[in-house]
């Protein structure tokens, strides 16, 4: 039997149309997320960005990591850039109060913004981080106990970044509760290169100004890079056997190695960087799926690291 050419043509059109509908439904647009930070030179930042990327890869997202290389002001224009690119979400690692214009641009475009070890702000959905209050208290109390509540302490701080500012503030409070502990100097290092080099230089100057053995009992650092710089300065000055106690926060691989070696660098607090990154990715996924996050801060657990456990696998 001869087929009807008109019927055949109509059937072909119908099949083609159905195929197009199926393709349109099956090929959903890939979720695009921008991660913006001026602090990628810091090991901690590198680790939780990697954690975010790993979690995002499992979710099939397209992640664009933007490093403004220490330029906080540039974060605003980078946020505006990705808003114009119509990303689905933005993750920042910077003080949100310093990039308000960018956050407002994202809000106006209805693009959710998340903090990853940043700080809290009404324009952020939430901030995923470690509990800086607890970490600082733990290391400051460690220092106070190790020096028997007396002596000069050098502090390395960085008040321009909220998660680190909190640590310094809490350590100040702990030390002020010990009448015989004196904060000899509160140092803010240049972090453009990561912080080790300038911290070493500043510690060398402090050591030179305080040459008497025992004149410096401890160095409390709000993160590991200054602690490592201080360690280098102390060892280079031949004062490694003096018993100066050094503590940091982050427990990055270099710090763990130094702690395991049993020298002046005695303790740090291990942040779960991969956990911060993956938890931030989960928060993004929940919001993009239509869920609401009530917490302004989501804390990821930490652990004190000393020589006893420094070699343990994280």
List each model region and its residues.
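Bacterial N-terminal signal peptides that target proteins for export
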Residues: 2-14
């Amino acid at each position: 039997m001869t087929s009807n050419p008109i019927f055949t043509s109509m059937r072909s059109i119908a099949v083609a149309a159905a195929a197009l509908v199926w393709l349109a439904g099956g090929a959903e647009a890939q979720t695009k997320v921008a991660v913006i930070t001026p602090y990628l030179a810091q090991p901690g930042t590198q680790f939780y960005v990697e954690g975010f990327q790993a979690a995002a890869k499992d979710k099939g997202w397209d992640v664009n990591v933007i490093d403004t290389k220490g330029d906080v002001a540039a974060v605003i224009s980078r946020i505006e850039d990705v808003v114009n690119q119509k990303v689905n979400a933005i993750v920042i690692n910077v003080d949100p109060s310093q990039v308000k214009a960018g956050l407002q641009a994202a809000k106006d475009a209805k693009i959710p913004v998340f903090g990853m070890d940043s700080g809290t702000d009404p324009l952020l959905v939430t901030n995923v981080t470690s509990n800086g209050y607890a970490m600082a208290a733990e290391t400051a109390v460690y220092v106070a106990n190790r020096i028997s509540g007396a002596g000069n302490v050098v502090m390395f701080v960085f008040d321009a970044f909220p998660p680190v500012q909190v640590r310094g503030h809490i350590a100040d409070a702990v030390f002020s509760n010990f009448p015989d502990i004196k904060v000899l100097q509160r140092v803010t290092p240049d972090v453009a290169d990561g912080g080790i080099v300038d911290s070493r230089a500043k510690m060398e100057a402090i050591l030179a100004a305080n040459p008497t053995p025992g004149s410096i009992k401890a160095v409390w650092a709000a993160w590991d890079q200054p602690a490592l710089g201080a360690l280098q300065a102390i060892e280079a000055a031949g004062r490694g056997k003096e018993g100066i106690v050094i503590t940091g926060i982050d427990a990055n691989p270099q710090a763990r190695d130094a702690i395991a070696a049993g020298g002046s660098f005695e303790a740090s607090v291990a942040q779960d960087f991969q956990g911060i990154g993956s938890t931030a990715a989960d928060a993004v996924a929940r919001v993009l799926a239509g869920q609401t996050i009530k917490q302004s801060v989501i804390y990821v657990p930490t652990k004190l690291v000393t020589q006893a456990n420094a070699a343990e696998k994280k």
